[in-house]
């Protein structure tokens, strides 16, 4: 039996050796380059560096010409431009680890210089029609005006305290297209990202151009969203800043609890009398 198996084992060994010879040294498996954006080339000029980063990390989904593929949208139409490109990279929404994955905010995978390089390359190479990166100065924004703009245009989706939440029904798209969409809060977004989102309308968010929200109002709005991150709580404990319903419920529970304890104390005292 052993003699019968010997030629077979020798044949298998020779086949494996031949595969190793033709294949060369076998190293550990590595994911595709577009899943490793942090290891970008940094020695080239801004536009050239942006081209290298784009072709390596973005072209797989958006195409080398920026016209999009079945995995990613066209970058030469709509509000695509410097502001939107900077927004999705600054907030970590791009690049996604898997193309079908829904964009969500996370830590950016690129350094500031790399983001600027990609933005510059996309702008020069594809000439998208979207707006430029807005210039803002939250320190000089009018909080009162910002609160009015926020209440009129933002509070319906992002809540009065800026905590976001689930989008139930979009006024134009209906429930079928908005189910499962979560509106982000402002806690993890800087002022520039908020301004860029206002001007470009990423995802299900509407676009607010200069006619709807002027540059002065935009400056006031981002000043107010920055204030919402750490507002002054004149009434005491914020209770999560989720609104008056929860505050009222807590008030009722605490009030009724104190009242029940008082009634019990009175009843105990009355029972002790001779």
Enumerate the language-model features and the residues they cover:
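Extracytoplasmic low-complexity, Pro/Thr/Ser/Ala/Gly-rich segments
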Residues: 28-73, 78-84, 92
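Extracytoplasmic electron-transfer domains, predominantly the class I c-type cytochrome c fold
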Residues: 76-126, 171-232
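Intrinsic disorder/low-complexity detector
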Residues: 32, 38, 42-45, 113, ...
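Hydrophobic secretory-pathway targeting helix
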Residues: 1-41
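C-terminal capping alpha-helices of c-type cytochrome domains
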Residues: 15, 20-23, 107-133, 209-270
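Sequence/structural segment immediately N-terminal to covalent heme-attachment motifs in c-type
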Residues: 44-63, 140-165, 171-172
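Intrinsically disordered, low-complexity Ser/Thr- and acidic-rich flexible linkers and loops
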Residues: 34-37, 166-178
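Detector for the c-type heme attachment site
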Residues: 20-22, 55, 61-67, 76, ...
């Amino acid at each position: 039996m052993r003699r019968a198996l010997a030629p077979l084992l020798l044949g298998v060994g020779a086949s494996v050796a031949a595969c190793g010879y033709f294949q060369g040294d076998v190293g550990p498996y590595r994911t595709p380059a577009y899943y490793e954006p942090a290891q970008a080339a940094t020695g080239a000029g801004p536009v050239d560096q942006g081209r290298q980063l784009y072709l390596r990390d973005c072209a797989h989904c958006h195409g080398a010409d920026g016209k999009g593929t079945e995995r990613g949208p066209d970058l030469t139409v709509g509000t695509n431009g410097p502001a939107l490109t900077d927004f999705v990279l600054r907030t970590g929404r791009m690049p996604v680890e898997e193309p079908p994955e829904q964009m969500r905010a996370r830590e950016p995978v690129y350094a500031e210089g790399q983001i600027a390089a990609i933005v510059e390359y996309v702008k020069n190479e594809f000439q998208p029609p979207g707006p430029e990166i807005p210039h803002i100065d939250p320190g000089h924004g009018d909080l009162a005006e910002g609160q009015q703009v926020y209440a009129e245009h933002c509070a319906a989706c992002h809540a009065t305290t800026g905590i976001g939440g689930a989008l139930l029904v979009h006024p134009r798209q209906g429930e079928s297209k908005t189910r499962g969409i979560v509106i982000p809060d402002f806690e993890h977004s800087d002022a520039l990202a908020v301004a860029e989102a206002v001007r470009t309308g990423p995802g299900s968010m509407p676009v607010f151009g200069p006619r709807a929200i002027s540059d002065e109002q935009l400056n006031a709005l981002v000043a107010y969203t920055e204030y919402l991150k750490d507002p002054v709580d004149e009434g005491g404990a914020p209770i999560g800043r989720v609104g008056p319903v929860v505050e009222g419920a807590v008030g009722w529970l605490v009030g009724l609890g104190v009242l029940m304890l008082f009634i019990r104390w009175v009843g105990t005292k009355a029972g002790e009398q001779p």
